[in-house]
């Protein structure tokens, strides 16, 4: 608990305001899910990321709160591949919604909720009161609800901005980087050096990590020296040495460098030789997509998870399959 409080203060410091936040619950909130999308077209595809939430605002909320809801929707849209369209839904005029009013909640029961603001029926039914900008997770009627609150409009906007800019946006960069990093390994395995180089340097590929490095910069300055050393090593490999090896079409060197960079990621995420920087275990159903990506290239878990990176798993009772 003490560690969580310290991290929250550090996160909030860069925004110059205090924030009450259910850290683990907000980080692990089921924002998205994977589905088979575009059914009924030749492009029908599995593992498509779509929203797993409705963003709810009260019918009488202020324009500032409505704008904040749009900002959260913008970053959620960057994380997903689409809204879950199909010719059937379009023909029926049932294009899926993302933002709904508090009066529509009972009509749309198939997703979790992000409720932005306090002038709505959900907050009133829960009897919630807020003294400061707040991100709070509750459960009601069998689904998770992330409440974005505050004692006034200004504080609600601050909490919503934190959710959009620091939580969802960070996940966008993290998962784009992670999944494309696995694709780079697969391309190296098959000698597709140009494809690997392009994936490594693309802004939506591995370079998507630049978003996270920007967001983490205020915290990075306060990291212990041993953590900074590991991050510096990772950056040199990912952005200097590995691109060079790919240009040289040196397969063994590229695989070795990829492996070394993976180890640095494990050090930060699992606390190997340095303090553990990731304070929660990721959701298995979201994170484990990387296994299916690796499988498409003919790679198995053991091709990457061995030795110091042998650990594979998530929460207690769940493991990668």
Swiss-Prot record:
It comes from the Bacteria. One of its GO terms (cellular component) is membrane. Coiled coil: none annotated. The keyword Membrane does not apply. Residues 1-18 form the signal peptide. InterPro entries: Cell_synthase_bac (IPR018513), Multihaem_cyt_sf (IPR036280). Keywords: Signal. Pfam families: BcsB. One of its GO terms (biological process) is UDP-alpha-D-glucose metabolic process. The keyword Signal applies. This is Uncharacterized protein aq_2175. The lineage of its organism: Bacteria, Pseudomonadati, Aquificota, Aquificia, Aquificales.
């Amino acid at each position: 608990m003490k560690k969580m409080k310290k991290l929250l203060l550090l996160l909030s410091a860069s925004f110059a305001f205090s924030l009450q936040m259910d850290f683990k619950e907000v980080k692990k909130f089921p924002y998205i899910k994977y589905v088979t999308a575009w059914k009924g077209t030749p492009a029908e595809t599995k593992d498509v990321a779509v929203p797993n939430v409705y963003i709810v605002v009260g019918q009488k909320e202020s324009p500032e709160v409505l704008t904040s809801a749009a900002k959260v929707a913008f970053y959620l849209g960057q994380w997903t591949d689409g809204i879950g369209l199909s010719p059937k839904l379009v023909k029926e005029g049932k294009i899926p919604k993302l933002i709904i009013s508090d009066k529509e909640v009972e009509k749309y029961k198939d997703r979790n909720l992000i409720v932005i603001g306090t002038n709505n029926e959900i907050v009133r039914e829960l009897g919630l009161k807020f003294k400061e900008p707040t991100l709070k997770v509750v459960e009601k009627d069998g689904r998770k609800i992330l409440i974005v609150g505050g004692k006034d409009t200004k504080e609600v906007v601050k909490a919503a901005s934190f959710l959009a800019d620091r939580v969802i946006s960070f996940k966008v960069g993290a998962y784009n980087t992670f999944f494309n990093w696995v694709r780079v390994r697969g391309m190296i395995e098959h000698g597709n050096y140009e494809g690997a180089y392009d994936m490594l340097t693309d802004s939506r590929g591995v370079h998507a990590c630049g978003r996270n490095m920007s967001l983490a910069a205020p915290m990075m300055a306060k990291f212990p020296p041993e953590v900074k050393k590991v991050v510096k090593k990772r950056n040199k490999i990912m952005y200097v040495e590995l691109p060079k090896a790919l240009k040289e079409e040196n397969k063994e060197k590229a695989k070795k460098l990829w492996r070394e960079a993976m180890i640095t990621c494990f050090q930060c995420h699992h606390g190997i030789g340095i303090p553990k920087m990731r304070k929660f275990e990721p959701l298995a159903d979201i994170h484990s997509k990387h296994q299916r990506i690796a499988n498409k290239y003919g790679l198995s878990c053991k091709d990457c998870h061995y030795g110091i990176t042998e650990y594979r798993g998530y929460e207690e009772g769940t493991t990668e399959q």
